[in-house]
Curated annotation (Swiss-Prot):
Its main location: cytoplasm. Its cofactor is a divalent metal cation. This is 5'-nucleotidase SurE. It comes from Rhodopseudomonas palustris (strain TIE-1). NCBIfam families: PRK00346.1-4, surE. The gene is surE. The keyword Phosphoprotein does not apply.
Length: 255
């Protein structure tokens, strides 16, 4: 099985080394094509106004000056054009990709692009806490991911579906199990703007995120709830985002 690995944290990110280890636990034919620089939060963007630069940084390891989407396209349609990958693994992201993260995440986008190209694709993310922020517990993803991926691949991944896997912020032995979840939803106030000032007194701004409060505990059955209870969350995400229920109602409204 030929596996293409990518991420959004960049070619030198520790999570990329982790996803490569996960891939090598499944196959010996592993290729890494990842962004030259950190591309967190770029979602599914394509580089259409700038040329892509490709640099070989080691055997079967390539850095692309572009987005995760660019990397999957370069990997599958150029670097591996003679024999396409059988599987795309995107991650392991530093931090979870759940709820609304799904629409912002470059990690998810890398897997989505693989799906668009007709390849079974998984997005992998490792949650961290305030205490583990600077040293996420990569061993949790490394320990549990290979078995999950093997089982899902054996069952078969439907076309136009991405498998989004999030690992809780606990050691491997503390993981309570694996659950299939639905995409959760946060309180709309989870985004914030931080205003700061440079040395000349000019303002600049950072987009930030509020942590979930106790009173905002997530709904049961969601990716958020699974991680909070130390379960691995496995969420199938469809490429087709059509709201079928509203479509039917809208058709009657506009008839």
């Amino acid at each position: 099985m030929r596996i293409l690995c990518t991420n959004d944290d960049g070619i030198h990110a520790p999570g990329l080394k982790t996803v490569e280890q996960i891939a090598r636990a499944i196959s010996d034919d592993v290729w890494v094509v990842a962004p030259e620089l950190d591309q967190s939060g770029v979602s599914h963007s394509l580089s259409l106004n700038d040329p892509l630069r490709l640099r070989e940084v080691g055997p079967r390891h390539f850095a692309v000056r572009g987005t995760p989407t660019d990397c999957v396209i370069m990997g599958s349609r150029f670097i591996l054009k003679d024999k396409a990958p059988d599987l795309v693994l995107s991650g392991v992201n530093r931090g979870r990709n759940v709820a609304e993260d799904v629409v912002y995440s470059g990690t998810i986008a890398g897997a989505l692009e693989g799906t668009i190209l007709g390849l079974p694709s998984f997005a992998l993310s490792q949650e961290f806490t305030i205490e583990t922020r600077n040293a996420p517990l990569w061993e949790t993803a490394r320990t549990h991911a290979p078995d999950i991926i093997r089982k899902v691949m054996a069952a078969g991944v439907p076309k136009n579906t991405v498998v989004n896997i999030n690992f809780p912020a606990c050691t491997p032995d503390k993981v309570k199990g694996v659950v299939v979840t639905r995409q959760g939803k946060r309180n709309p106030g989870f985004l914030r703007i931080d205003e700061r000032h440079d040395g000349r007194g000019n303002p600049y701004y950072w987009i930030g995120f509020e942590r979930i409060k106790v009173e905002d505990m997530p709904a049961e059955g969601t990716d958020l709830a699974a991680l909070a209870a130390n379960f691995v969350s496995v969420t199938p995400l469809k490429l087709d985002r059509t709201d079928e229920t509203f479509s039917a109602a809208l058709a009657n409204t506009l008839a």
